[in-house]
Amino acid sequence: MPLRFGPAGVPLSCKGRTIVEGMDDITALGLETMEIQTVRTVTPQHFNEYWQAGILSWKSDFEMNMHGPYYADLLGDRRSRQRTLMKMETSLQAAKVINARHITYHVGPYGERKAGRETNEHLANILQGVVERCHQLWGNEEDEIDYAAFPWVLENNPTLIGVETSGQQSLWGTLDEVLEVVNHVEGTVPVLNMAHIHARGNGSLRTSEDFGELFDQVREQYGGKTFYCHFSGIEHRGGNAMHYTQLKKSDLKFEPLAEYLAEEGDWLDVTVISDSPLLEHDAMYMLQQYDKAKQKLLERRALEERRYKLALEAGLDPAELLAREQEQARLRTGAIAEPAETEAKKAKPAAKAPAKPANNRINFEDEDEDEDDIF
């Protein structure tokens, strides 16, 4: 199962602030991907740095990704939509230059539209045009000049257009809406922002079973196996995301997702980007938790295999042998607990006798109490 972790931006610990230096640091940390943030706009001076990063990613198989402008209004009036599409055009050009595998976009508020099929169909038509424009910009094999500058256009597919789940009730982007749209537009993929899904569901992702239901829904409605995920802690209220937090300070935990990916994720091709304020630190934490979950799974499977072999040798059913092991463990626990309780009783200190008042001190206990006193 391809599974990659990385930060959303140049690592905080990187001494240099260029993308190439950030890629070197990310690789040294044992991570395999990153997401470049074009949160507001892309200027011409960025493109030389993007091209250098694209060459490095092509030669090293380092996965590059990009996030388009944060503010979007694809469902607004014609003027607002055109302004958003112009920003998307520039980011699509940058995605080609940097050899991005995914580029993530927000859709924006519902505006005057209502949630439903009509709105989703309208958005699907817009995104179909975005995909077609991306393929035009990507170039073709016959363009020698394009091939000389961007050799990956011959080997790699055009950038996938990612449609992100939103974290506000007023914004388009529930999981159902995203899956319905990407299922009808080839060249798009769902971007599962787990913090946003958790917030809109009022804290819905708490166990590995919750994540299992999420991915089962995606598999049934979308049918693909390639997923691009954002993960971070989140502070939320009333079904709305407030702001990102570090993982250890949120009720959204990565351990249940790590457990699910270790046990059921063999069919997935997953990229997980850390949106946490700690960036690469929480990306490394997620990788460590996944490795721990994988190790526990291997140990459990080895134990089950050993139990199965012992059961065959003893002529027992493996379930019967498991029941015996559990009973023996219970008896051992009880045998250890009983002496501990006995020792605790023996060690209990005797109650101290009340101290006698000194002769040179006033003894208030001998005086009659006045029932009228408040204190």
Where are these regions (language model features)?
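N-terminal pre-domain/capping segments
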Residues: 1-90, 189, 299-374
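Hydrophobic faces of well-ordered beta-strands that scaffold small-molecule active sites
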Residues: 3-9, 34-36, 64-68, 103-105, ...
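Active-site beta-loop-alpha junctions enriched in small/polar residues
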Residues: 8-12, 37-41, 69-71, 108-110, ...
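Acidic (Asp/Glu)-rich catalytic clusters
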Residues: 23-29, 45-65, 90-99, 131-135, ...
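Charged helix-capping and loop-helix junction motifs
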Residues: 47-54, 81-88, 119-125, 175-178, ...
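A short acidic, helix-capping loop that chelates divalent metal ions and anchors anionic groups
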Residues: 72-77, 111-115, 199-202, 238-241
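Active-site acidic/histidine proton-transfer and metal-coordination neighborhood
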Residues: 74-192
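Histidine-acidic metal/acid-base catalytic patches
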Residues: 184-194, 198-375
